[in-house]
Regions:
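Structural signal for conserved beta-strand scaffold positions within catalytic alpha/beta enzyme cores
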Residues: 10, 56, 153-155, 198-200, ...
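Local cysteine-cluster metal-coordination motifs and their immediate loop/turn environment
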Residues: 115, 184, 202-232
């Protein structure tokens, strides 16, 4: 884990009201693994850091995917190239990839696409065939950037791809499922694919396990800290009835 001042290197739009921000952070980029996240802090700005999945890492840069859903994310989108944030990361436990699987399906809903470019690249490097299934409310909300061997789209309004849930667009016979998106979607993933790996969202304060604000209820009882034991879990290990389902996905933790 590193804490560094990370200048903004670039910004690009990838969906309606959705952007990728690239920050210069060579040490964090070199260490980041699929499914991990970084905590960003603006000065001056909100008191607490904001968690974001590592979207990509390349050329010493860490990329994050975000949409303005509050004061902190709105201020991040107002940054100009050269403006710096305090970056803490990489944090958490990410996706486990096994070359023996042969193939893997990445299933994302909305901003749940956030951790999957880095995950797809790592999976392909491990010799896995990658199928990415991405869903959103409408075509304009679908992330325009994807990686993998094939992609399937799903929209709630039927404006692109399958008319309905991304889960229903997953082709038969795919290998291990990795999923990220709203908790209601992940609860449905747990019913269909109990052994799937899911990146969960929850409230978070410190990102280092101290504040206990990111509690994830486990099905056998007790709680984990998403920033330490997560944010990636076996889907069936989470008590989805007790995990908040109303959060707007912004990061996996």
């Amino acid at each position: 884990m590193f804490q560094t001042d990370a200048p903004l290197a670039g910004r690009r739009q990838v969906a309606r009201d959705t952007f990728v921000l690239a920050f210069e952070a060579p040490e964090v980029a070199a260490a980041a693994l699929p499914g991990q996240f970084v905590n960003l802090l603006l000065r001056p700005g909100p008191l607490l850091r904001r968690p974001f999945s590592v979207h990509r890492r390349r050329e010493g840069r860490v990329e994050v995917l975000l949409r303005a859903v509050g004061t902190g994310t709105a201020q991040l989108l107002d940054l100009e190239p050269g403006d710096s944030v305090s970056m803490l990361g990489p944090l958490g436990r990410g996706f486990r990839l096994d070359p023996g699987w042969g193939s893997v399906a990445l299933v994302s809903g909305g901003l749940g696409a956030a951790p999957f470019p880095i995950t797809a690249a790592a999976a392909r490097a491990a010799g896995l065939r990658v199928t990415w299934v991405h869903g959103a409310h409408a075509a304009d909300d679908l992330c325009s950037e994807w990686e993998g061997d094939e992609v399937f789209w799903a929209t709630d309004d039927g404006s692109r791809g399958h008319h309905g849930s991304a889960l229903d667009a997953v082709p038969a016979g795919v290998g291990t499922v990795l999923a990220c998106g709203p908790n209601l979607m992940l609860a449905a993933v747990a019913e269909r694919w109990p052994d799937a790996q899911v990146a969960v969202e929850t409230y978070m304060g410190c990102g280092t396990g101290v504040c206990l604000g990111c509690a994830v209820p486990r099905i056998e009882g007790g709680y984990d800290r998403a920033c330490q034991e997560g944010p990636v879990y076996r889907a069936a290990d989470i008590d989805w009835r007790a995990l908040p389902s109303h959060l707007h996905y912004g990061a996996p933790a």
